[in-house]
Amino acid sequence: MDDLCEANGTFAISLFKILGEEDNSRNVFFSPMSISSALAMVFMGAKGSTAAQMSQALCLYKDGDIHRGFQSLLSEVNRTGTQYLLRTANRLFGEKTCDFLPDFKEYCQKFYQAELEELSFAEDTEECRKHINDWVAEKTEGKISEVLDAGTVDPLTKLVLVNAIYFKGKWNEQFDRKYTRGMLFKTNEEKKTVQMMFKEAKFKMGYADEVHTQVLELPYVEEELSMVILLPDDNTDLAVVEKALTYEKFKAWTNSEKLTKSKVQVFLPRLKLEESYDLEPFLRRLGMIDAFDEAKADFSGMSTEKNVPLSKVAHKCFVEVNEEGTEAAAATAVVRNSRCSRMEPRFCADHPFLFFIRHHKTNCILFCGRFSSP
């Protein structure tokens, strides 16, 4: 599983850099683990150069253990009885005339806890779109709806991969609502008021010298997961950190054993992000080209039909960070009171930062985000 988490981590950072580079004032939020597991399921049916390109894009090198690795990883991360809630909606929707192989369907279920559902895009496109959206909404407890916008599928659609994920967790050290107050958040362009939460407690903290960036680890209850935040110094642009970022550096900067636990004053904005991506252009940039091309796609391990390309890869992700943790909660009145001593180190996220949610046991990056626009 270590090799797999290494592959997923490398893929996570590559995709993160591509998603974020177009406009560095835009927020980014996605789940690399759920995207790579969804694509690995498709990879199971790929052959020839389609498979070679997918393996390169996903940093997976094809051997029999990949799918078993994902099986272990998914059951570890999604297991019941955890103090966090993770709802993943992963499913392939295929045009029913494409004659999908029973073995492939069985393996989707066995390794990825996912189904290939056959629909008739050719006969009733809009009905199929609504059916897919309803299914995702149900799977994510209503937090994620409309994963496919109007017009995103058509009668020629052959294969749609839908991947949505919703996470809810409570902080190990909750922020006290009575200290939350309006505070300015500085972006490159302007200053905006955000609801800034405050907590003084012992947290693991470090400093990445080469990019002049503070590193803070905020654990969730029972410390199975934690949020790791990379906050550049006031005079360092976040773009500098992003440019230098690789998976190797991420591991070095955020290595739990290298961080020191000490009392620190943490200022963190409440945030709520919902991001949707049509991943095709980004996956093409990572070298996955043939899968989307009707003349070249080879998914003969999935269907007896020739030329069944991936028509759409849709990913939608929702996160809310508040005093209790990452979950939706009712708002209460805020008492403005900012009494706090100035002696402890400060970690004040009042300008753009990167954040990652990591699963400790597997060292897997579940989510990657950039908060740069309140």
Swiss-Prot record:
Q: Where is this site: Reactive bond?
A: R339, C340
Q: Which terms are listed as keywords in the entry? A: Cytoplasm, Protease inhibitor, Serine protease inhibitor
Q: Which domain of life is it from?
A: Eukaryota
Q: Name one Pfam family in it.
A: Serpin
Which InterPro entries has this protein been placed in? Serpin_CS (IPR023795), Serpin_dom (IPR023796), Serpin_fam (IPR000215), Serpin_sf (IPR036186), Serpin_sf_1 (IPR042178), Serpin_sf_2 (IPR042185)
Record flagged with keyword DNA damage = no
- Which protein family is it in? Belongs to the serpin family. Ov-serpin subfamily.
Function, as annotated, reads:
Has an important role in epithelial desmosome-mediated cell-cell adhesion.
Please report the name of this protein according to its UniProt entry. Answer: Serpin B8
What is the originating organism of this protein? Homo sapiens (Human)
